[in-house]
Amino acid sequence: MFRPRQYFFLLLVLAATTLPAAELRVGNSYQLIFTDVDQERLATSDGHVSIVSVVTRENEAKAQALGNRVPQQYYGDPKYRLINIVNFQQGIFAPLRGVIMAIIRHRLDAEAKNLQKVYTERKLKRNPRDDIYVVADFDGKAVSQLGMAPKSPEFAVFVFDGRGRLVRRWNDVPSAEALTAALQEAR
């Protein structure tokens, strides 16, 4: 038979497992770590200014719109990076994940070819493929770090300075002006 204390601990455990993730607050610093589809470790506090977007398959066009709003002056600058986290909302079976990662890498290769024109015009010697980051979040661990529920259909954009301080957060694609202001503040 359960005693009152055991009921209390049972309720405490159940409550802890059902609480939503805490939303990140602008001005606070966060040492978040993600692993992209190329197995590169990306941290919000490693000296890079990071634009982090969270997208699902349904709002993928917003990620493209965000990329189009990043000012070209930041293209190829190793101090800045755009990280797209694809939230698969825990809906992909493990055997399919490798195939999906291969498809994502193929799409990144194609995007790098498009970016090569911009890099050539700006006389950048870097390989644009090295500047494109996508995190395939199959299990919800990446979005949970950002205070989002793993099954959330939400789109979000975060800008972190090089020390991991959250400069801005949006729940939609920010204007080019707002994004530029956040990047300048994050420098």
Task: Pin down the residues of each PLM region.
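Boundary at the C-terminal end of the N-terminal hydrophobic targeting segment
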Residues: A21-E23
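A short beta-strand-turn-helix
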Residues: Q31-V49
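Positively charged n-region of N-terminal signal peptides that target proteins for export
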Residues: M1-Q6
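A short, polar/charged loop-to-alpha-helix boundary motif
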Residues: P174-R187
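Structural microenvironment flanking redox-active thiols in thiol-disulfide oxidoreductases
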Residues: E60-N127
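Thiol/disulfide oxidoreductase modules built on the thioredoxin-like
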Residues: S45-D46, P128-D131, D137-S175
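Structural cue for short, hydrophobic secondary-structure segments
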Residues: I51-V55, N84
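Bacterial N-terminal signal peptides
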Residues: Y7-T18
